[in-house]
């Protein structure tokens, strides 16, 4: 039996009232006969597919209506200063959803769509389950929508048992009724006049659909609240683009935290104790494995025989098990994927194709994609299951993709974002036995351009990291970086990438840039070591071993006779350095000296809760890291000295260090004009005296020695040739303590980057202490033993430099390293069970638990702000400053004011400091902001270590030629060597990621902001000397 339920539309006499009336005489069709009582079939039309041609009235889905959330005060949401596309959670729109729905109801197409939903409910809930035994009619049917958009329902649906036996009638809400043969049962549906409520609906492509529901409805006498005829799909076709049917992280906090709520019921005290301790041990194990892995790899490169190229991937293949162990600690189950990835190369011993890599690790890859902060990916990840459905091996995966090749390739080519990748995609779809790193190497040109564009965008969005990002930008400025994944010799490629000047195209011009190492050093040092400027130029910035010039490279390529082969020298020095690090510094023997011991492990963790919070009542964890005389051997320092030039030009060095400084020139000019103190009458001998002093110093230079030898004298107190590489240079002994503590610490949810049912938790604002006051740093070379100093004579300058070095080392060690560091941080835990399933998992089918970690938090207004250009305009710079730099400058200004009295900068309260960063305006008093202020951490640290030493020469005899004879006056000479090492850092840690809109075209999500400034200052030496007799 089939039903033709007749719903016709009519407009009642009362103006503004629309009604739908279902006639009392409707078409009934049973197995044996058909009776038609009304000739209204002409108005019927089949508008749905697959329902056995069930005919419906002119109740139609509305044409698709999309509301795009845009920037601008006249739009639904004001994106403040960010014009690009951002993503919202539905809670950001608040009552705007209802407002847009109410406006939509005034549209002529709205009411037919409402009735279409009603008709589907009649079919699916009343007719379809009962059509085999019951006829269905509607003695009364009224659905009205008044001019003020209030809806009412008044329906009687009559079921008639047309069989010869008793039948079970199935009704909505799980109700069943027994109906005798030939008997009827009336089912009542009523709703008093009421405003229809909006019901958000999840749609693909990050779109929020709007459905509707009644606040309350009566189904056969039973009141049902929040009732929708079509809860999972609607014929309204009204939707918001770029809006997710979920909640942002701040709204989720309200839903998930508090007495009886998810986090409070699922995080137990014993979990916190176990997780915090596991977190410390895990981080320690990870650090040791990374160090040991690096040591093994560098040892392989260092022991490479000349003339036998050793590629990066061949060495990675040898240490793949270490990578597996490392990444399993980072995240259980990830290790196998990384190990397989390393083997996806034709250079690997056991090669793994791209398709086998994907097939064997599909679940891990899918989870990684989910965790990337790329909202566009999220809507298509569901297709992965379809792709793998029925596939049993990697060959099957290849054949499945082959069947889609004619669809995939054109789609890739026509998409602006993926068109450049089409050659790579085509090769991947054509060749079954291909490998990841072979593809990277072969298509390095494509990947270079993509990566350059990515880094350029990233640099725009991270102005406070401009220097660091610039290094990576320049590294991938040419295709050569991808040769690391080819068969090229790794050591040669490192020399080429990091120690060689680069030729780059800037518009129409070809420019030469410093090597990446020199670029980094210049960025780090800046103008803060002006006193050493000329020396840095000679030995670092213009050193061919660290900054091999294009001209030298060309001469080497032509094998020019007599030219120094700096490329070979670089490779030789790198291998020596790598070998020593691998065999000594990062050897397993040396690393095993460092151990972690538990002191306190939070034996009695207690959790407290209120209606809106979950707190750790008290946290008290302490671990001790014992260093066990960790050694840095002389060989490491000697290997580093190999990068200094071996030219014999110490006279030039002495000139630049002592006799070309402004202080020396000023003193010399003064004495020439005034004479020596107490000997003003003898002005005429002053120029000769200075000339003799300079000659005396220069005559003390051993002409066979280089700057390497002078550094050997200074650092080892011995001749380089006499220094044993296996002896200790520095030993690190004693221990340092790591402490986590605090009281009444908030516990909040923690999320991956994309929508994910798996979540973690974080303990906010943990007092973190690293107490290094018990660390013993011992410089082993404490006594000068050199028998053949680079600068000796009566000035004994090599020995003086050694004394300056030991004094500076002791000062910096005590003032910087042997200190107690205190700051706040969050402990974040993504706990897993033994079977690797998440211990905390939400039901993301529930929109209130579907958390959108990347949602723009409109309404909070807490995005980072761009500073007005007029405020920050400086010479040659009209760009707005990053907010974290503004914060840094404000606090640094206070630091400068305190510097004279050696006081630490005052720690401003969080609210004041956030005022530098966030667009909170007049909203500080709102309760919504209180949790943000309370749960944001700002750490500011300033450290300065000064050293004060001097070079002294007692009773230095200076020969001075007079007219008829020579005299030998004696002078005491003193050259102060003073300077300081300064470290300043500012970090801001938000409880959740928020959009940084400080750079208009490059908004991004940030959770942690860091600014670090380091400077080494060496004061211009101001020599002083005085006459002490003959």
From Swiss-Prot:
| Annotated TM spans | 7-29
Any one GO cellular component localisation term in the record: membrane
The source's superkingdom equals: Bacteria
Location within or outside the cell: Membrane
One of its Pfam families is P116
* Key word Amino-acid biosynthesis present: no
Q: What membrane topology is annotated for this entry?
A: Single-pass membrane protein
For this entry, the protein name equals Uncharacterized protein MG075 homolog
What are the entry keywords? Membrane, Transmembrane, Transmembrane helix
**Which InterPro entries does the UniProt entry name for this protein?**
MG075-like, P116
